[in-house]
A protein has these predicted regions:
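Residue-level signal for inorganic ion chemistry
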Residues: 25, 39, 201, 224, ...
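Acyltransferase
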Residues: 18-22, 238-261, 286-291, 315, ...
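Short helix-loop capping/hinge segments that flank enzyme active sites or metal/cofactor-binding pockets
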Residues: 55-75, 221, 275-326, 330, ...
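Gly/Ser-rich, acidic/histidine-flanked active-site/gating loops
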Residues: 69-72, 207-272
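Glycine-rich, small-residue loops and helix-cap segments
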Residues: 14, 57, 63, 97, ...
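Hydrophobic/aromatic ligand-binding patch that stacks against planar heteroaromatic rings
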Residues: 94, 137-139, 249, 362-365
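Short glycine/serine-rich loop segments
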Residues: 87-205, 370-377, 382-384
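Short, well-ordered alpha-helical
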Residues: 1-84, 112-113, 348
């Protein structure tokens, strides 16, 4: 993989011009992407490459539900074939202001739903890269790009990061702007980042969010709660072994680890995530459903069909459950610095018929808290664990994740 921090260091010391860094990304995409299908289209060759700015020389992949004025934005659907926004999304404008080059639109499932894209997992093309941010995770994993944007409504950043073996963060809700991002669920949709290491995504997030404290170090002896989320079902043996390995690595790095069983309000909140999501999706995609229902892919079409039966009372009750769980989570974090749990049920499923299961992600998306995927090194397809911190404490989540990543690397 290509490190954002390494590129920036080489640009800073004068050994790598920013234009050469962007040219190198174009060359890697041309060489590697035909076998992976992560990239949908590239910015024009004539695009300006800034020589200055804290992210100068950084080529960024932009999930194709995020508007770009210089490239078509099709939302993964033929309904929007060739559609060209008049303006960049706010997050894209921010990247340009920092000197980065939004170089490529990355593959997404249609409207960031569950119907798979054509992208394959660069670790093994016989397996899914996950979704819905399929292309962003795959492009970083394949070493084509040092940074990519994704979005998460259920598990669409953390799960593909785990399947592809890259670092990623789903930040606190609304830390990054969603203006210009196609809405699926306005109470859940969150822009996230993929990178080669936790340090890379921490640096990028600190700059994009204008919060330097995000790169602050972790407490000397962070308190970690090891959580299995039993109400979500069982992870497989490999995922549980990776979680145990990460916990022991954290202890060697100085963390204090104890087990945590989440109380009943969290099980109820987990259960109502689909109600919040689908009630809002029914409205967010109302035009597409009314005018182009038959052009919608089958899983999304069925999801929206079922969502027509949801009532405002169902939605309001679900939101109340979520609010109760958020209050209790705030109290829980008085005694712990971070929660450690699995990122996915297991390794990436075989074939491209499914993007995997978000069961271990969706509670934390509903809670709006920061989640970081930490790859766990090993043989075979990648596995990951997620580090979760209190709302607004993205820096702590990243610092703890960085400590675990380092401890695993020293094994």
């Amino acid at each position: 993989m290509i490190s954002l921090l390494d590129i920036r260091a080489r640009i800073a010391d004068g050994t790598l011009p920013a234009a050469d860094a962007i040219r190198g990304a174009r060359e890697r995409i041309a060489a590697q992407d035909p076998a992976i299908g992560a990239i949908l289209r590239l910015a024009p060759e004539t695009a300006v490459v800034p020589e200055g700015g804290p992210l100068a020389g950084i080529a960024v992949g932009v999930k194709d539900i995020i508007a770009t004025a210089d490239m078509a934005t099709e939302y993964g659907s033929d309904i929007y074939a060739g559609w060209r926004p008049r303006a960049d999304a706010a997050i894209v404008s921010r990247l340009r202001a920092l000197g980065a080059v939004p170089l490529a639109k990355t593959a997404t499932t249609a409207f960031a739903g569950l119907d798979p894209a054509a992208t394959v997992n660069p670790r093994d093309p016989g397996h899914t890269p996950g979704g819905s941010s399929s292309g962003s995770a795959a492009a970083v994993a394949a070493g084509m790009l040092p940074l990519a944007l994704g979005t998460q409504t259920g598990g669409s950043v953390i799960r593909p990061a785990a399947f592809c073996g890259v670092a990623a963060i789903k930040p606190s809700f609304r830390l990054l702007p969603t203006v210009g991002v196609k809405t699926f669920s306005w109470a859940l949709d969150t822009v996230g980042l993929f990178g080669a290491s936790v340090a890379d995504i921490a640096h990028a997030l600190a700059l994009i969010a204008e919060r330097p404290a995000i790169e602050a170090p972790a407490p000397e002896r962070p308190r970690l709660a090891l959580c299995l989320q039993d109400f979500a079902g069982s992870a497989d043996a490999d995922a549980l072994a990776a979680l145990e390995r990460a916990a022991r690595a954290a202890e060697r790095g100085g963390a204090v680890v104890h087990d945590l069983v989440l109380p009943e309000p969290f099980a109820r909140a987990w259960a109502v995530h689909p109600t919040v999501q689908d009630f809002e999706a029914r409205q967010a995609l109302a035009w597409e459903y009314a005018e182009h229902r038959d052009a919608l892919p089958p899983v999304l079409r069925g999801q929206l069909d079922r969502a027509q039966d949801l009532t405002a009372a169902d939605y309001d009750a679900a939101r109340r459950e979520a609010h109760r769980a958020r209050r209790q989570l705030k109290e829980l974090f008085a005694d712990v610095d971070a929660i450690l749990t699995v990122s996915s049920v297991g390794r990436a499923p075989r074939g491209l018929g499914s993007t995997g299961d978000a069961r271990f992600n969706r509670l934390w998306t509903l809670m709006g808290v920061p989640c970081v995927n930490v790859p766990v090194p090993g043989d075979g397809l990648p596995l990951g664990v997620q580090v979760i911190a209190r709302f607004g404490d993205d820096g702590r989540a990243l610092a703890v994740a960085r400590g675990i990543e380092g401890a695993l690397a020293r094994e």
